[in-house]
Each structure stands twice: as C-alpha cells, then as structure tokens.
C-alpha cells in the first residue's frame, strides 16, 4: 500500500470504524489553503479495505478539500479496477474517514471525538 502510516504533522484526522466487519481506518491530512498537500492512512481490516484507502490517498493528493469530499466509493472501486459485490462496503470506510477529516478541518479541529 502507498501512503500508509501515521502523519505526525497532520492538521486534519478522521477516524471511522465499521462494527459489522471490524474494519477501521484513520485518515491523516495535511491541508494548506484548502488543498490537500499530503495524506496518509492506517487501515486495520481486509485487503480490499486497505487497497481502497491506499488508492484514495493517491486520488485526493493535490485536490481541494471540496473536490476530495465529492469523491464516491464507486469512484474508488473503479480506480481499483472494480471490487466484488460483497467487498464494495470496504471502499466506504476510507471515504468516510476522509470526509470526517475534511469536516474536522472545516470546523477548525484536528480530530473530533464523535
């Protein structure tokens, strides 16, 4: 996976867990002037969840937070070349973590507790 690991100087962090399958993702963003300069992630889960989070980091680096927020799990799955139907939910956790990080950035907090 690309861009895997914690980012010490992230100014926006989103964390999401899926209680149904046990997967969890933390997305770390370094945002300057509403542009995502750097992004890393930590995903604990199946290979499809890790691959989806990894490709998502490649897709959003250099984009505005608005452009990144609009990305869909379908776009992530397409970028991977498709996912089996029963694994489509795995592409959602990275998107949700990214959106939570962007929401935290917009709200002026690095990480929220909800």
Please give the residue ranges for each predicted region.
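Short, thiol/selenol-centered motifs that function as redox-active sites or metal-ligating centers
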Residues: 21, 43-52, 90
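Beta-strand scaffold of nucleotide-dependent catalytic cores
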Residues: 38-42
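Alpha-helical support elements that line or immediately flank enzyme active sites
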Residues: 48-63
């Amino acid at each position: 996976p690309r861009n895997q690991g914690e980012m010490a100087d992230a100014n926006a962090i989103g964390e999401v867990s899926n209680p149904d399958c046990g997967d969890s993702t933390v997305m770390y963003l370094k945002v300057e002037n509403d542009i995502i300069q750097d992004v890393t992630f930590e995903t604990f889960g199946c290979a499809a969840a890790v691959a989806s989070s990894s490709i998502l980091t490649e897709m959003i680096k250099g984009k505005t937070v608005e452009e990144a927020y609009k990305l869909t799990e379908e776009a992530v799955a397409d970028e991977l070349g498709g996912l089996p139907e029963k694994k489509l939910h795995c592409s959602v956790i990275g998107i949700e973590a990214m959106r939570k990080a962007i929401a935290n950035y917009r709200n002026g907090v690095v990480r929220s507790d909800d």
